[in-house]
């Protein structure tokens, strides 16, 4: 089977990461994959979310195939011939508010194959145009996307399929850390706003009063956090996923910065790296509300409610090895349930139900 993706690739965003996880699983299963990526100029206009990583493109990625637009003042374009000549059996569109709806609609009308839209949009306002794409099926990561967005636009329920965001397979990477083994190392990475590091800095400074071996390692793509201390190491990089696994395996706890939002969201970062089994601590918010934990916030991840709750839970992770092992067991169950191989098969099964 020859499967095409219309998507970002090699960037720090959940849209491109979803395509990367699925594409690599399809290839492992023996299918051929072609990725049609946007022009660098148009994608990089979304400064907040689009940052290229240090990874090199594989041969199956074709860039400069379409433009990202705002769909209100711009129509954009798609190089139809570049896609049509591939003779695809299935096209998966990673859909969010910047895909060019009008030229894509014209392309879809010419394709005589199943077309699946993976719906990434987070609220009804940004979804206004992209819900018009004439795809055969719309995949959402959980029921919230239908209940809070697609139903608003009267999209038929039978057109919508719930398929979880996939968990990336773990990399067999050697642990790396910037400090000695006697330090208890907390780690954060990404492009989140600096304000979302406040809880972690606050909590760790409190913990330092009891534990002088606490160290915090921060890697950001958009500059340093404006706070310096001898117990903090900061790097400005956009490492590959394989390198991230080295850093995670060298760390004791992963502090994942996510703020509050009213939008319908998932944390693609979490699904990208949870298989490392380094305990993830994250604010209890809409990003993780569908991930089940016990009443205390412990499960495959650790959810915290406020600073005091965060300090208490970080202290437990430092002192209670049995708790850490229990979290790792929960992670393995989560990875088995939502692994990329299983999710990829669900997409193939869905495609088989589409008749052309």
Swiss-Prot record:
<keyword id="KW-0328">Glycosyltransferase</keyword>
<dbReference type="GO" id="GO:0016757">
    <property type="term" value="F:glycosyltransferase activity"/>
</dbReference>
<keyword id="KW-0808">Transferase</keyword>
<dbReference type="Pfam" id="PF13439">
    <property type="entry name" value="Glyco_transf_4"/>
</dbReference>
<protein>
    <recommendedName>
        <fullName>GDP-mannose:di-myo-inositol-1,3'-phosphate beta-1,2-mannosyltransferase</fullName>
        <ecNumber>2.4.1.361</ecNumber>
    </recommendedName>
</protein>
<dbReference type="InterPro" id="IPR028098">
    <property type="entry name" value="Glyco_trans_4-like_N"/>
</dbReference>
<comment type="function">
    <text>Catalyzes the transfer of the mannosyl group from GDP-mannose to di-myo-inositol-1,3'-phosphate (DIP), producing mannosyl-di-myo-inositol phosphate (MDIP). Can also use MDIP as an acceptor of a second mannose residue, yielding di-mannosyl-di-myo-inositol phosphate (MMDIP). Minor amounts of the tri-mannosylated form are also formed.</text>
</comment>
<keyword id="KW-0460">Magnesium</keyword>
<comment type="similarity">
    <text>Belongs to the MDIP synthase family.</text>
</comment>
């Amino acid at each position: 089977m020859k499967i095409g993706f219309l998507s970002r690739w090699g960037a720090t965003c959940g849209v491109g990461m979803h395509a990367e996880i699925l594409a690599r699983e399809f290839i492992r299963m023996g299918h051929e994959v072609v990725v049609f990526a946007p022009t660098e100029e148009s994608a990089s206009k979304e400064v907040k979310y689009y940052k290229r990583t240090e990874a090199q493109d594989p041969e199956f990625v074709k860039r400069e195939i379409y433009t990202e637009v705002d769909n209100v003042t711009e129509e954009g374009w798609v190089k139809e011939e570049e896609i049509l000549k591939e003779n695809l059996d299935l096209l998966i569109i990673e859909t969010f508010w910047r895909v060019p709806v009008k030229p894509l609609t014209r392309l879809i009308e010419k394709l005589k194959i199943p077309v699946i839209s993976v719906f990434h949009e987070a609220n009804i306002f940004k979804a206004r145009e992209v819900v018009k794409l004439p795809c055969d099926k719309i995949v959402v990561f959980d029921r919230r996307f239908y209940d809070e967005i697609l139903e608003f636009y009267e999209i038929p329920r039978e057109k919508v399929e719930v398929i979880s965001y996939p968990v990336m397979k773990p990399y067999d990477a050697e642990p790396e850390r910037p400090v000695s083994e006697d330090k208890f190392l907390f780690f954060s990475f990404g492009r989140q706003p600096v304000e979302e590091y406040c809880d972690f800095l606050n909590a760790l400074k409190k913990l330092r009063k009891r534990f002088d071996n606490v160290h915090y390692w921060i890697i950001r793509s958009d500059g340093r956090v404006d706070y310096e201390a001898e117990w903090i190491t900061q790097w400005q990089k956009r490492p590959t996923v394989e390198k991230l696994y080295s850093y995670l395996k060298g760390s004791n706890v992963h502090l994942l910065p996510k703020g509050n939002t009213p939008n319908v969201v998932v944390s693609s970062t979490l699904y990208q790296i949870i298989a490392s089994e380094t305990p993830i601590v994250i604010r209890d918010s809409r990003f993780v509300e569908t991930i089940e934990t016990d009443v205390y916030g412990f499960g495959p991840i650790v959810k915290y409610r406020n600073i005091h709750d965060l300090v208490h839970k970080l202290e437990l992770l430092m002192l209670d090895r049995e708790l850490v092992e229990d979290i790792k067991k929960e992670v393995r169950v989560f990875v088995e349930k939502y692994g990329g191989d299983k999710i990829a098969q669900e997409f193939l099964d869905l495609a088989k139900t589409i008749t052309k």
